[in-house]
Design a protein with these regions (language model features):
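Short, charged, solvent-exposed linker or helix-capping segments at domain edges/interfaces
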Residues: 128-133
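Charged/polar low-complexity intrinsically disordered segments
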Residues: 3, 12, 26-28
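Flexible, low-complexity linker/hinge segments
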Residues: 135-146
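Non-catalytic interaction-recognition regions
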Residues: 22, 33-127, 145-638
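Short alpha-helix boundary/capping segments
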Residues: 1-7
Length: 638
């Protein structure tokens, strides 16, 4: 029995030794895929346990980047730990710093400034971190699984009475980029579009085409279908304005004041009355009206498809208002029967939202026709029937803030439990130097013209540079497309989405400063360096030795690369694609300074040379991943 007890004791001692040895190895030597901050966080938790005998959570470890005026990479703020240590801030910081220095290989040194523990990370840790990043082709990206939350994102939402314009371009690019960062945070994403293919605005184009079109088609005119229909929307407005002006003058001649005369003229305009009559016929399923509507919409869809392809956006599911508005009308009628809404004397149906601090909201007109709110209720209901959505995000301009506030309340009132969880990704308007865009006046920046102009401007810049003269014509045009579209996308995405912005094409195509072409040029430069290294027979190992001597600037770049994962998380959490855009710019700006100050291919120390090649390779990788989330392509050559 005594021998068995001795053996058991020895076995327990051995197991304890193994566990302790493994723990120390894990803290000291093991290469971890975690960022250094996460490793330090785990080590601080262990230090507090060892020093003060208490467990703390990761949230209690307050790490931040060290301010530039102090020595260090990361700073631990210890004030939140004083109740545990029961010591002065300086003493607590000193003890934790010394424990980390003695028990881990993370630190080269540390210093204490009051309650701030400034940590200088050991150079070996930076190279270990770079090796981990280098081994991960999708660093910073969390791929969704079958069980991941499902997020639906609606963007684009065009009307079929006009082509897409600059405002639509910002919407589409924001929607695509938002989908990218949300998916990169481990969510399944369904990209969706609601096409406003019915309503009075559609009838205006249809009526104008009947009156003034003479059977014109996209084929006979040589125009894209969306542009052709847009011309007739403008034509309707032109004739309507002339009609109103004539009627207003008539009513004023009869003694009516200017304001009342204009209101009466707009109401009694024969052209507008015909458009409303056509809308009523459409909702009554009139065969002739429906046939014309289908024909003209098909022209528009073909045009839209070309524009979407040029912008590099697509959708997983497209809804059409003509399919959803009846579902919305039915939901409103059911709400009316339950006393949730009320009918006015003229027959229109309204929602009283005064108890919610809002006003009354029209849901059905007196003639029974629906409004945008009716359609959105129906579309939301269909979407949640079609998909097990965990979250619904609408990418719509900030002029619709009130609309989505009301939609959320109405859906909740109708008993749809997901109503209050809707997210309105509200963004600012794109303005021109001469003011806002108005499609009814034909004074818009057309999306197709904008895309063509950006590509042409990029091509001109490339030709003037007279570089890569060995490129074929096809290659030059492809680079021009990538650069032109990159300039457009980056310029629109780098700005906080909530802000209004002024679009300047010339500024966006600049190869210097905070622009897409500047980032693309840096990427192409790195790819060129890597190709030259291969041609020169320079071999780079899969794993860098950790004892290579590196500079402070190189440490900073590794830290900047490692920040990518946190930036992606922030962008997904806060719905801010601009965070990724500006991160990419700051990274390439820092790399360009490094490129200016340090030799790479001409470096005589082979160990430093291979380190800098791996560093450059991973700058390019992270930039490609980040810009890819935004829908921006990277050229291999420029």
């Amino acid at each position: 029995i005594r021998q068995i007890a001795v053996h058991r004791f020895r076995l327990k001692s051995f197991l304890c030794f193994v566990l302790i040895t493994n723990f120390v190895a894990k803290i000291k030597n093991k290469r971890l895929s975690m960022k250094i901050e996460q490793q330090l966080q785990a080590a601080v938790i262990e230090a507090v346990k060892a020093l003060y005998g208490q467990d703390i959570t990761p949230e209690q470890v307050a790490l931040q980047k060290t301010k530039k005026e102090f020595e260090g990479h990361l700073t631990l703020v210890v004030f939140g730990l004083l109740r545990i240590s029961r010591k002065k801030p300086e003493d607590t910081a000193q003890e934790i710093g010394q424990w980390l220095k003695d028990n881990t290989s993370l630190l080269q040194s540390f210093n204490v400034v009051k309650g701030f523990l400034n940590l200088v990370i050991a150079p070996t840790q930076w190279i270990t971190l770079l090796n981990d990043i280098d081994a991960d082709d999708h660093f910073g990206i969390t791929k969704p699984t079958e069980d991941s939350p499902l997020v639906m994102i609606e963007y684009s939402s065009p009307n079929t009475n006009k082509p897409l314009h600059l405002g639509h371009v910002r919407n589409n690019l924001l929607g695509w980029a938002l989908a990218g960062v949300v998916e990169a945070n481990g969510n399944r994403v369904v990209k969706t579009n609601i096409v406003n293919d019915r309503g009075i605005h559609i009838c205006k184009s249809m009526l104008a085409w009947l009156k003034y079109g003479n059977g014109e088609t996209p084929q006979s005119s040589g125009k894209k279908g969306d542009h052709l229909i847009g011309d007739y929307y403008v034509a309707f407005d032109k004739h309507y304005r002339a009609e109103v002006k004539e009627l207003q003058a008539k009513f004023m001649a009869e003694g009516m004041n200017e304001e009342d005369a204009k209101a009466k003229a707009e109401k009694e305009s024969p052209l507008m009355q015909e458009a409303h009559a056509m809308l009523v016929k459409w909702e009554a399923n009139d065969p002739e009206v429906r046939a014309l509507w289908r024909k003209m919409n098909e022209w528009v869809y073909e045009g839209f498809d070309e524009t979407y392809k040029a912008l590099g956006v697509s959708f997983d599911k497209i809804y059409y208002e003509s399919d959803t508005y009846l579902v919305g009308k039915q939901a409103v009628e059911e709400g009316l029967s339950k006393g949730l809404f009320f009918r006015k004397e003229d027959g229109s149906v309204w929602a009283d939202l005064t108890k919610d601090g809002l006003d009354e909201k029209l849901l059905l007109r007196a003639d029974g026709t629906s409004v945008y709110m009716t359609q959105d209720i129906g579309t939301a209901k269909l979407r949640f029937q079609d998909f097990p959505i965990n979250k619904m995000i609408y990418v719509v301009g900030n002029e619709q803030n009130y609309h989505f506030q009301v939609l959320s309340i109405l859906l909740d009132r109708l008993g749809f439990e997901w109503g209050k969880s809707l997210v309105h990704f509200s963004y600012g308007m794109v303005e021109l130097p001469n003011g806002k865009m108005k499609s009814r006046e034909g004074t818009v920046v057309d999306a197709d013209d904008l895309v063509a102009g950006m590509i042409a401007q990029a091509r001109q810049t490339i030709d003037e540079a007279k570089k890569n003269t060995d490129m074929s014509e096809e290659e030059k045009q492809e680079v021009a497309r990538i650069v032109g579209m990159g300039a457009l996308k980056y310029f629109l995405l780098k700005v906080d989405a909530r802000k209004n912005m002024l679009f300047n094409p010339e500024e966006s195509i600049d190869f210097n400063g905070n622009t897409g072409p500047f980032i693309q040029y840096t990427y192409a430069r790195i790819r060129s360096i890597l190709r030259k290294a291969v041609d020169a027979g320079i071999n780079v190992p899969d794993t860098l030795p950790t004892d290579i001597e590196i500079s402070t600037k190189e440490e900073e770049i590794i830290q900047h690369i490692a920040d990518f994962a946190a930036v992606v998380r922030q962008a997904g959490k806060e719905y801010q694609p601009a965070a990724v855009a500006n991160y990419c710019y700051e990274l390439v700006k820092e790399y360009n300074q490094f490129y200016h100050d340090f030799s790479i291919l001409r470096e005589e120390d082979s160990r430093k040379q291979m380190f800098r090649l791996v560093l450059s390779k991973n700058v390019a990788k992270v930039v490609r991943l980040g810009m890819g989330l935004l829908g921006i392509e990277m050229p291999e050559r420029m």
